[in-house]
Amino acid sequence: MTGRRREIRYLMPMLPLVHHPDYDARTVPDDHRFPMRKYALVADMLRAAGYEFFEPLLAPEAWLHLAHDPAYVGAILGQTLDAKAARKIGFEITPAIARRSRAAVGGTCLAARLALEHGAAVNLAGGSHHAGPDGGAGFCVFNDVAVGALLLLQEGAVRRVAVVDCDVHHGDGTALILGAEPRAFTASLHCEQNWPREKPPSDLDIGLPKGTGDAAYLAALETLVAEALASQPDLVFYNAGVDPHADDRLGLLSLSDAGLAARDRYVAEACASQAVPLCAVLGGGYSSDASAVARRHCGLVASIDAIGMSAE
């Protein structure tokens, strides 16, 4: 990145982080394909590093209705979703999953508000980009980023938003929900051969071939971020999924630890250079070793916080 960087000036000692104890839905077993324990582990690691957290409220139904069909929302909250729809999501819809899903949406909405106030913030969950208008998929129940974007637009807190989605999977649900919203720019950088098979168009899609490594990935990222910022957003939502990592079992790309750190740092620097607030969410990350995934997620916080500490 070229040019003088602007410092992210927090109105508090550290980068604002949002966490809710119900992010870890304990009804999901440890051997499930989705490493639910990572959320508690991320919080433990960051707490040990001296961070404190903002705790969000559970998103009210009215917020969820901004992005999702009320009948679908009611089926989740009432645990009446049919078995086929639940299988598409990948979870049994228990009270804990319903509560977790509302907490994650509330967390992204709170992180977005904190980002507008302080320059940047991170929700230590979120990034449920496969949830579409009338149903969930791929471990995603409610689309927290879409809800957050539409809520802030409705309230007039922002005039335009951009979504920079760097999870390894295409942001299909976000594209469907925000596709008709002219004030939202959606951009997805993903593995083209990966799930989902059908990829409804975002405003900008960059699909990378299997095995793409750091150099080619970061070159594509520059294009993605430049186009997103050219849309002149008042806020960027950044899905910082760590599933492009070479060791991720669902990823198919080959980023290193250094590559992920460079990605996160580049996004933060680009937003800071144009004084655009950044709301980051964790997104995906899949491994039988939940601690390894949690450590990768913690790298997001370190990368964003380092911009504020070291910027000229």
Where are these regions (language model features)?
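Polybasic, low-complexity intrinsically disordered segments
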Residues: 1-7
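HDAC/HDAC-like amidohydrolase catalytic core signature
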Residues: 7-312
